[in-house]
Regions:
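Short, surface-exposed, charged amphipathic helix/loop patches that serve as local interaction elements
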Residues: 3-4, 9-13, 20-98
């Protein structure tokens, strides 16, 4: 028996985040998400946060983020939303019912 999975996969369907007029692409490849999980589980410090952003965004997008000069609160919000999207979660799911 041959089971075709091709039509059920989302090849190159990377989520994107828009901030003002900038669009950032989140790396949601399996390899990246597995590395991300390892980073989150073993870290939590500043180096872990930097490693997380390095995994989730391309160098070009990281430079764009840097130029935005975000506050730490906004930076952490961006990181959280990007992690949710990479994991296939709805970033707004935590805010339902408020």
């Amino acid at each position: 028996m041959l089971y075709s999975l091709t039509d059920k996969l989302k090849f190159n369907d990377s989520p994107q985040i828009q901030i003002k007029d900038k669009v950032l692409t989140v790396n949601n490849s399996a390899r990246t998400v597995l590395e991300l999980m390892d980073t989150v589980l073993t870290g939590g410090d500043l180096e872990g946060a930097k490693a997380t952003m390095n995994l989730l965004f391309s160098e070009k997008d990281r430079k764009t983020i840097e130029k935005m000069n975000l506050s730490i609160e906004d930076y952490m919000t961006l990181a959280g939303v990007a992690m949710d999207l990479a994991l296939g979660n709805d970033p707004d799911a935590d805010n339902r019912g408020e």
